[in-house]
Design a protein with these regions (language model features):
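Bacterial Sec-dependent N-terminal signal peptides
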Residues: 1-24
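Structured catalytic-domain cores with a bias toward divalent-metal coordination
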Residues: 19-389
Length: 389
């Protein structure tokens, strides 16, 4: 009898504990009001006590996030006190090329644009990188450097690659199957670790901002596998408190006709209550931090396990996904594009498209809502309903 009573007492305690841990909309709102500040100020606040800040980028195609990133870089404190930014996008062996581009002098805007496109055609191991925000980012960074006495240096961290050295589909397969590609998080961490000590200290310190996609930024390891994400590697290399990981607000994943909102939409509802005013905040020991992380592949983790903070910038229904770089496939580049297309598509065991189909894949400008496949209105209606419940 005593054992039975003890058993049901444990069940009751576990149930009550679950209720105590669940967070209401008001809990999230209260937390934001108590702990948050403007996103740009939040990033520089992190740099006061840590040398490396990692921003977990949302969908690679989103252009709105680069408005914020450029605001951070445009702040005078960045060039004067930090000076170095690193990105996932871009093959490491193109780092010198990109800095010649960004710190060069051009007589006209068209002259810079020509140099930018010539560089972009060789930056990536895909036939071309089609995300328009790369143009947005590099053009913005060039303008910052052009008008600033203190120059910002860009480091590229992705796999070493050159299209000039790839002649066959088998050679591309060998690259794609290489350990460097299979363990890209380790590769990008290694490349950063090679460049970081070479930085010129600013005010006696080396500091760096790293921009990498959300999954890479995680302070996590795949459950049951010896595969660290980039954020995990960086914290192990440079110290838990010396590396701060911040995630931009995002959705969970795409699944058929749905794009689930984090915490069943309560986060987004809290942002809406706050008037969608951008903010950044630490999440440890907050309702945000206690929220279970949505990807079970990493085990039973909470948000405070995988990141140190969050930045809310733009509601989900205002995100803009843009692909295609108009003019990137010039007439002079068409032959080289088709050479790459044949190699790449054969290596991936896919039918090789003709030029009239291949060219628009990269230079046709196309924008669509960040809520795709749902409409922005339906997502906003879902959030507004949560506010009324």
């Amino acid at each position: 009898m005593e054992k039975r009573i003890a058993f049901w007492f444990c069940v009751l305690c576990a149930t009550l504990s679950g209720y105590a841990q669940s967070s209401s909309l008001q809990d999230y709102v209260t937390s934001v009001r108590a702990k948050s500040c403007a996103p740009v100020d939040y990033v520089f606040k992190l740099f006061e006590h840590s040398d490396i800040v990692v921003i977990g980028e949302r969908d690679h195609r989103d252009t709105t996030q680069y408005e914020l990133i450029l605001d951070i870089l445009r702040d005078a404190r960045f060039a004067e006190d930090i000076g170095y930014v690193y990105t996932e996008v871009g093959c490491v062996n193109r780092t010198k090329d990109v800095n010649r581009l960004l710190q060069g002098k051009y007589k006209t805007a068209q002259a810079f644009n020509d140099a930018l496109y010539a560089y972009l055609r060789n930056e990536d191991f895909n036939p071309l990188w089609d995300k328009y925000n790369r143009v947005q980012f590099l053009r913005g960074l060039y303008e910052i450097n052009r008008s600033n006495r203190h120059k910002i240096t860009l480091g590229l961290t992705d796999c070493k690659f050159s299209w000039n050295k790839i002649k066959t589909a088998q050679e591309y397969r060998d690259f794609d199957d290489s350990p460097a590609c299979a363990y890209r998080d380790s590769t990008m961490s290694l490349h950063f670790a090679e460049m970081y000590p070479k930085q010129k200290p600013k005010n006696g310190k080396r500091k760096a901002l790293i921009i990498t996609n959300h999954p890479h930024a995680l302070n996590a390891t795949f459950a049951g596998k010896d595969y660290h994400r980039q954020g995990k590697w960086l914290k192990e290399l440079y110290g838990e408190d010396n590396v701060k990981i911040v995630m931009l607000n995002c959705t969970e994943y795409i699944q058929k006709e749905q794009m689930p909102l984090v915490a069943s939409g309560l986060w987004d509802a809290a942002f809406e209550v706050m008037g969608c005013q951008p903010f950044g905040m630490d999440i440890k020991e907050t309702p945000f931090g206690r929220e279970p992380y949505f990807n079970a592949r990493y085990g039973d983790l909470k948000w405070e396990d995988i990141a140190d903070g969050i930045i809310y910038y733009k509601p989900i229904y205002e995100l803009v996904l843009t692909i295609g770089i108009p003019g990137i496939v010039s007439i002079d580049f068409e032959v080289e594009l088709m050479r790459r297309i044949r190699i790449y598509f054969e290596a991936m065991d896919r039918p090789v498209p003709p030029l009239e189909e291949a060219k628009p894949m990269y230079d046709r400008f196309l924008s669509f809502p960040g809520t795709y496949p749902q409409s922005p209105h339906s997502v906003r209606d879902t959030i507004l309903r949560l506010m009324k419940e």
